[in-house]
Amino acid sequence: MDKIINAVETNYKKEDIPEIRPGDTVRVNVKVVEGEGEKKRERIQPFEGIVIKIRGAGLGRSFTVRKMGADRVGVERIFPFHSPSISSIEVLKKGKTRRAKLYYLRDVKGKIRIKERKD
């Protein structure tokens, strides 16, 4: 059974995914389709924030990015690593954390400070 799953997954896996850990500041460029029919247009929309969670394995692996929007409203988006709608993922800063899930950042008001990792 595992051989069949691995054979199917190899067709859909992306190879150009950078190493991401919780606490990293990333910019995810997402392909957004606007309009319908002949007015259909595709553009790239960046989403920049801190990775607060990574879950799963294989094709089902995903990560959650949190950013502070207008009026200090927190916005979270969940991205599958191997999604065809993700154009690229850039790691802007590497964060040093002691937790795998950074849910406590949801309660923090104002600017979030995470120490930088030196790799």
Swiss-Prot record:
Xref: NCBIfam families: rplS_bact
Classification via Gene3D superfamilies: 2.30.30.790
Name of the protein described by the UniProt record: Large ribosomal subunit protein bL19
Organism: Petrotoga mobilis (strain DSM 10674 / SJ95)
Entry similarity comment: Belongs to the bacterial ribosomal protein bL19 family.
A GO biological process held by the record: translation
Domain of life: Bacteria
Listed GO MF terms: structural constituent of ribosome
Annotated signal peptide: none
GO CC annotation: cytosolic large ribosomal subunit
